[in-house]
């Protein structure tokens, strides 16, 4: 049996390939994955050991070939400097867990519409309203992360990853 470096054993791209290998024998080796994705074998190795961040196009290829839509969110929210500021990290969760998170998030924004109207009624954001606005933003960002989880859940169950 081949030894796996500790950094590789927890790498999201490697784990996605190994999950894909359960259904596609070619994914058991980097050589086979390279042929399936079009990403060079040595480059895949460096991506999987964590010494190289893949290009977005490579992540798209791997997500499609491995049927792992969660790689898209992972890359954008954790590897891309712009995405780290703008894309909420999402988990690959089951429907029951997503539902509970969604209902909790809805409960947390229950009266935010009234609060937002109160803040916006004069058309200005005063310094004392900034903390309230940040609280509203945090609640909405929580919903955005849950929306990403729902998208991952749907894409994972689709026969083929659909383009939005």
What positions do the PLM features span?
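A short, Lys/Arg-rich alpha-helix, primarily the initiator
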Residues: 1-25
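Short, charged recognition helix plus adjacent turn
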Residues: 3, 75-104, 157-164
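The alpha-helix within a helix-turn-helix
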Residues: 17, 34, 63
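Short alpha-helical DNA-recognition segment
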Residues: 21-46
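DNA major-groove recognition helix of helix-turn-helix/homeodomain DNA-binding modules
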Residues: 57-75
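Generic structural signal for well-ordered, non-transmembrane alpha-helical segments
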Residues: 60, 100-110, 134-148
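Acidic, glycine-anchored loop motifs typical of Ca2+
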Residues: 90-98, 107-132
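Mid-protein regulatory/catalytic core that forms ligand/cofactor-binding pockets
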Residues: 117-164
């Amino acid at each position: 049996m081949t030894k796996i470096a500790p950094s590789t054993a927890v790498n999201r791209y490697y784990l996605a390939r190994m999950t894909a290998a359960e259904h596609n024998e070619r994914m058991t080796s980097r050589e086979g994955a390279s042929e399936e994705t079009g990403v060079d074998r040595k480059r895949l190795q460096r991506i999987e050991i964590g010494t190289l961040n893949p290009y977005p196009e490579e992540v798209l290829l791997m997500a499609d070939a491995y049927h792992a839509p969660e790689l898209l969110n992972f890359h954008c929210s954790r590897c891309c400097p712009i995405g780290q500021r703008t894309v909420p990290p999402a988990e690959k969760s089951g429907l029951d867990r997503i539902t509970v998170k969604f209902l909790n998030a809805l409960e947390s924004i229950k009266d935010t519409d009234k609060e937002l109207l109160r803040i916006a009624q004069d058309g200005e954001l005063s310094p004392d309203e900034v903390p309230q606005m940040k609280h509203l933003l945090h609640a909405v960002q929580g919903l955005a992360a849950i929306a990403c989880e729902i998208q991952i859940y749907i894409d994972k169950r689709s026969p083929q990853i659909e383009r939005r």
